[in-house]
Each structure stands twice: as C-alpha cells, then as structure tokens.
Regions:
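Extracellular/secretory pathway and lumenal proteins
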Residues: 16-17, 47
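N-terminal export signals
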Residues: 1-14
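Residue-level marker of intrinsically disordered, low-complexity segments enriched
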Residues: 11, 17-18, 24-25, 65
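Beta-strand-dominated extracellular/periplasmic modules and repeats
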Residues: 36-197, 203-204, 230-232
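Ser/Thr/Gly/Pro-rich low-complexity, disordered linker/stalk segments of secreted
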Residues: 19-39, 112
Length: 232
C-alpha cells in the first residue's frame, strides 16, 4: 500500500454561514446528520479499508503540513490522533500518517490528467500526543463515493499498521451540504447524484469508527478532528 499528501486552500463566503459542531452519535449506517469520533475509551480498532484506487506513489517525498498545492476551495484544518491498541490505546508517538483526497471537482493528483501533480497529498509524524495536523481544502465528491479522506498509518520504523478512510457527517445542516452548495467558492456539483454513507461502497457496512467531527463555517473554514485506533 502507498501513502499520501496534500495542497492549499482559499477561504470562502456564501449566504449559509452557520457554525457546524457535529458531535452527536452517528448510527452504524451513517444516516445521521451528526457524528462522533473514535475515542480511546472503547479502544476499538478503526475499520480497515482499501487504499485504492488512487494511493500516493511516493509518500515519503511529501512530508508537509499544508497539502493544498494549487487547489482552491474552502479551507479544512485536519487533526488526526493515532492511538495504539497494543498499548492500551496510548498515543502512538512518531507514527507516520499519510493522507490524500480529491479536489473540489472530484479529481486526484498523480492520476489521469494530473500525473505531474501531487496536490492534496501529504505526510506528517505524530507528536507525543499522537497528533498530526494538515491544512487542506474541503474535499468534493465523485460518483459512487461519499465525501472522504484516505489515511495510511505506519509505525516510526515504517511498518504499515492501518489503511482506512475518514467519513463525514451528513444532514441538512452538515458541512458537506453547506460546502457543496457554495458555488461562490467553486463547488458546482451540489448534492444532486451524491452518494450518501449508507449507499457508499466503502462505508455502507458502517462508519462508527470512521466518522469525523467537523465544525466551522463557510466564511471561516472548517476543522475536522478524528481518532484512529491501530495496533503496532
């Protein structure tokens, strides 16, 4: 499996500038409009998912916090905490975390017409609290998939310990709906034809360990927080 990296963002404004703070529990089918992140209290392993079809070719060359590159869109600050089930879910300091996702139009770098680009892909090493942070843009979507971010976690020595994906909460006032309605910021697809988590070919079996917490607004940008439980 490969790993990942990421590009830059622009801040955006539209009429739906409501603060989102989606922290209530999500059901296993992902149908709730709110969500909860994995916590260390239950120490349940995060679901393993496919890295494909667009994994990063050489993630070790993309060590960076700001992964936006030349991509524009609504800013999304991502904070991921890596917990080690093998150590009673203590933070896994030094874990290498690769992330990657599509741009606002559903395109991935390194593939198709973007083979010479590496936007929206990046790697960071977890600090003493098991945390990594990235600055990116709010992902768009493409046919057959709900909004998501790919993650590949390694130990500091390079052992692969988790390949997974991050799901986003859904609902009428969710960030997903607000962002995809923000044509002023270049999100032109809207929600017509969108694949929800419950019908997604990756998330349809449940998203309880993959659901992020997303808060913020169109004008100020959004923040995503999520915990991933792996076993070293």
């Amino acid at each position: 499996m490969s790993a990942f990296a990421f590009p830059l963002l622009t801040r955006c404004i539209d009429e739906s500038d409501t603060i989102i703070d989606e922290t209530s529990t999500v059901t296993d089918d992902g149908s709730s409009s709110t969500n909860s992140s994995t916590t260390s209290s239950d120490c349940t392993l995060t679901n393993t998912e496919t890295a494909g079809p667009y994994p990063t070719h050489s993630p070790g060359s993309l060590v960076r916090e700001d992964i936006r590159g030349d991509r524009t869109g609504i800013e999304l600050d991502v904070e991921i905490t890596i917990l080690d089930q093998s150590q009673s879910c203590l933070p896994l300091e030094g874990a290498l975390v690769d992330i990657w996702h599509c741009d606002k139009d559903g395109n991935y770098s390194e593939y198709s017409g973007y083979t010479s680009s590496s936007f929206l892909r990046g790697r960071q090493a977890a600090d003493e609290n098991g945390k990594v942070a990235f600055t990116t843009i709010f992902p768009g979507w493409y046919n057959g998939r709900a909004t998501h971010i790919h993650v590949h976690v390694y130990t500091a020595s390079g052992k692969s310990i988790k390949v997974t994906q991050i799901a986003f909460p859904e609902g009428s006032n969710s960030a997903v709906v607000q962002v995809n309605s923000s044509t002023a910021n270049g999100y032109t697809k809207g929600m017509s034809g969108y694949t929800y988590n419950s019908s997604d070919n990756v998330f349809s079996d449940g998203v309880s360990t993959e659901m992020a917490i997303v808060s913020g607004s169109i004008s100020e940008g959004f923040k995503l927080t999520h915990s991933i439980v792996a076993a070293s």
